């Protein structure tokens, strides 16, 4: 449900404070209005509840507390919502250049935000888990390595996401390890890019063209909107005509045909992750505990049920990293469930670049 959190407005229509740095303004008066949950509950009662359907709402500006109101089954509203909080960790807060004001990626911020949502919705709601969609760029280009360790990186981020409680969303091409594109600015179709260029670069001159280009290459929505890459033939096998948008320059390297021909491809790793989630109740029902919150390279957490405990570990860096901080979780019951380096047998060995695994430890 597109921007569903904006369907209720304060009927006194209060003004925002006047600003000189932008022509348009969105904020607290646009979302989570006074009758929002009344309307959603009514929609559920009168329409949604009459069908065997799953509902997810796009809810920018929502906190975990608001998400609980949306997704608590007893409230009969929605099944889950898309949060944007983790998508904003690499932007400078309050900048007039908005999403184009890049802030260096800090894994600790990602862990903090995602863990807060895991813990605050546990047994009270449900998470929609995602790194990519039609409004977000490719995660391995944005926060990882899309060259030397492209496949390892894609599998590592997939492992982190699929080990959490909630419903993982896999956006087209994510299961192939597709990457961002780097086109000249005048070739981008996204109206957000075109408007921001005129507003920030041309008119207000708050960001240089070079810095804006780098930001577009990093975060433009068009990164995820190129035609899907089916094979290495003309137009990537997408069409015999002329596609509406330029193809990624890497379609001959990254495509469905190649993924299906390679036994250890990103595609098959995603299939294994999805099968694991269907087979293992712990991944659905177990609680969540973040480990090593201040580690700048390792994303690791526990999933625990009454019957067993798993550890999920991902080195989200290009370095070899020690697992010394996880020594207390070494167990004689270690059982690897999935790993993107096939020779991983336990916790003790150092983590190689973008190495990730899920392991039962009791």
What does each model-identified segment do?
Residues 1-362:
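Active-site and adjacent substrate-binding regions of carbohydrate-active enzymes
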């Amino acid at each position: 449900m597109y921007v569903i959190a904006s369907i209720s407005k304060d009927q006194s229509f209060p003004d925002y404070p006047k600003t000189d740095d932008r022509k348009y303004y969105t904020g607290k008066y646009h979302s989570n209005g006074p009758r929002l949950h009344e309307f959603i509950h009514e929609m559920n009662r009168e329409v949604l509840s009459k069908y065997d359907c799953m509902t997810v709402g796009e809810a920018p500006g929502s906190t975990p507390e608001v998400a609980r109101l949306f997704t608590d089954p007893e409230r009969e509203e929605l099944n889950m919502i898309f949060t944007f909080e983790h998508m904003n960790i690499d932007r400078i807060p309050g900048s007039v250049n908005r999403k184009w004001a890049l802030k260096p990626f800090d894994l600790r911020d990602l862990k903090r935000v995602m863990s807060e949502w895991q813990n605050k919705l546990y047994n009270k709601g449900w998470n929609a888990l995602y790194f990519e969609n039609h409004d977000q760029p490719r995660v391995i280009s944005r926060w990882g390595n899309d060259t030397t360790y492209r496949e390892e990186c894609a599998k590592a981020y997939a492992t982190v996401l699929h080990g959490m409680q909630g419903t993982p969303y896999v956006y087209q091409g994510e299961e192939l390890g597709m990457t961002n594109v780097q086109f000249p600015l005048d070739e981008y179709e996204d109206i957000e890019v075109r408007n921001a260029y005129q507003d920030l670069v041309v008119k207000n001159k708050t960001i240089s063209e070079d810095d804006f280009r780098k930001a577009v290459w990093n975060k433009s929505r068009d990164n995820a909107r190129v035609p899907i890459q089916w094979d290495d033939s003309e137009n990537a096998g997408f069409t015999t005509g002329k596609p509406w948008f330029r193809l990624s320059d890497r379609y001959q390297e990254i495509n469905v045909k190649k993924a299906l021909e390679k036994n250890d491809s990103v595609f098959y790793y995603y299939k294994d992750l999805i099968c694991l989630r269907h087979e293992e109740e712990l991944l659905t029902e177990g609680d969540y505990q973040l480990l090593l919150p201040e580690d700048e390279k390792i994303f690791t957490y526990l999933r625990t049920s009454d019957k067993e405990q798993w550890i999920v570990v991902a080195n989200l860096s290009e370095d070899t990293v020690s697992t010394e901080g996880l020594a207390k979780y070494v167990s004689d019951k270690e059982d690897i469930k999935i790993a993107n380096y096939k020779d991983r047998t336990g916790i003790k060995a150092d983590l190689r670049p973008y190495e990730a695994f899920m392991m039962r430890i009791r």
